[in-house]
Amino acid sequence: MKPSIYGLTRDELIAWAIDNGQKAFRATQIWDWLYRKRVQSFDEMTNISKEFVAILKDSFCINPLKQRVAQESADGTVKYLFELPDGMLIETVLMRQHYGQSVCVTTQVGCNIGCTFCASGLIKKQRDLNSGEITAQIMMVQNYFDKRAQDERVSHVVVMGIGEPFDNYQNVMTFLRTINDDHGLAIGARHITVSTSGLAHKIREFANEGVQVNLAVSLHAPNNELRSSIMRINRSFPLDKLFSAIEYYIETTNRRVTFEYIMLNKVNDGVEQAQELADLTKRIRKLSYVNLIPYNPVSEHDQYSRSPKERVAAFYDILKKNGVNCVVRQEHGTDIDAACGQLRSNTMKKDRQKAAAART
């Protein structure tokens, strides 16, 4: 399978065009066709010579994804299941917010982080997505908007889908630079958030990139004992190492960090744990924010359930009394396969059942 041209940054496309005997402006024209006019075929690039179109077609495909499933929620959330060229499946989610249209992208096929409450890790990591496959997720949603012809655009991106983004660091950074490029989709850096489970060394590297992209950290527990029991990554990067990296990030960038905290009934949602969380984040309170997330139950992880509203409210109140900036996250798509990785997992089960039935 040819690589997707979406996998190149504009500078890389310019370098490639020059290597193939073209002027730099030719690459800029191609970039415009891809991201402003959003063509789906190189033949639609009418100001590019037929000879160079032939070279493009020999070298690249445009969009490597096929849509397998699209589930639309009553609130307008759309969960997509896309098929990659090798037949593997990934999820992408469109969330309609009051401030714009936000897309959550996947960065890996499967996940090795091993969070015990998460559907994404039910299937171990099989491979990284390349930058073209990550960018193509945004383009698939934008193409959906274009067909609706209602002047909608992807305005916000969260890198919070299946996989650990910082375990696929270079492809994610290429993706970020591509969607942020002013000559293309021009999605503002401050409208993009990358979430990590806590790879401390990569948080430090990200701090040195000089990008204005937001950072979120999946925390989910306020002490090492509990965090290690529900998030295996904490055994490699315990809270002291993680918070040292976070403090370095804040000192280097002067940017706020968001902590994601999923509310698991009678696991991590007690008032004592709320106080521990307030104490843990005290030193960086001015440049941190806590996002309390209602849990979407996963059948394979039935030891966990959603915290009742009363427990969430009590937890929230403790944080607020301690001066912690926090919010309870708005839910999206609760009437579809809402948990991250759930649609993919359920579809793969159905595919296996169909295959087994066909053999009998």
UniProtKB/Swiss-Prot annotation:
It comes from the Bacteria. It is found in: Cytoplasm. One of its GO terms (cellular component) is cytoplasm. Its cofactor is [4Fe-4S] cluster. [4Fe-4S] cluster binds at residues 111, 115, 118. SUPFAM superfamilies: Radical SAM enzymes. S-adenosyl-L-methionine binds at residues 163-164, 195, 218-220, 296. Disulfide bonds join 104-340. GO terms for molecular function: 4 iron, 4 sulfur cluster binding; metal ion binding; rRNA (adenine(2503)-C2-)-methyltransferase activity; rRNA binding; tRNA (adenine(37)-C2)-methyltransferase activity; tRNA binding. GO terms for biological process: rRNA base methylation; tRNA methylation. Binds 1 [4Fe-4S] cluster. The cluster is coordinated with 3 cysteines and an exchangeable S-adenosyl-L-methionine. Keywords: 4Fe-4S, Cytoplasm, Disulfide bond, Iron, Iron-sulfur, Metal-binding, Methyltransferase, rRNA processing, S-adenosyl-L-methionine, Transferase, tRNA processing. Residues 97-335 form the Radical SAM core domain. It is an enzyme of class 2 (transferase). Its EC number is 2.1.1.192. InterPro entries: Aldolase_TIM (IPR013785), Methyltransferase_A (IPR040072), RlmN_N (IPR048641), RNA_MTrfase_RlmN (IPR027492), rRNA_lsu_MTrfase_RlmN/Cfr (IPR004383), rSAM (IPR007197). The active site is at 91 (proton acceptor), 340 (s-methylcysteine intermediate). Its main location: cytoplasm. It catalyses: adenosine(2503) in 23S rRNA + 2 reduced [2Fe-2S]-[ferredoxin] + 2 S-adenosyl-L-methionine = 2-methyladenosine(2503) in 23S rRNA + 5'-deoxyadenosine + L-methionine + 2 oxidized [2Fe-2S]-[ferredoxin] + S-adenosyl-L-homocysteine; adenosine(37) in tRNA + 2 reduced [2Fe-2S]-[ferredoxin] + 2 S-adenosyl-L-methionine = 2-methyladenosine(37) in tRNA + 5'-deoxyadenosine + L-methionine + 2 oxidized [2Fe-2S]-[ferredoxin] + S-adenosyl-L-homocysteine. Signal peptide: none annotated. Reaction proceeds by a ping-pong mechanism involving intermediate methylation of a conserved cysteine residue. NCBIfam families: rRNA_mod_RlmN (TIGR00048). PANTHER family: 23S RRNA METHYLTRANSFERASE, RADICAL SAM CORE DOMAIN-CONTAINING PROTEIN. Specifically methylates position 2 of adenine 2503 in 23S rRNA and position 2 of adenine 37 in tRNAs. Belongs to the radical SAM superfamily. RlmN family. This is Probable dual-specificity RNA methyltransferase RlmN. The gene is rlmN.
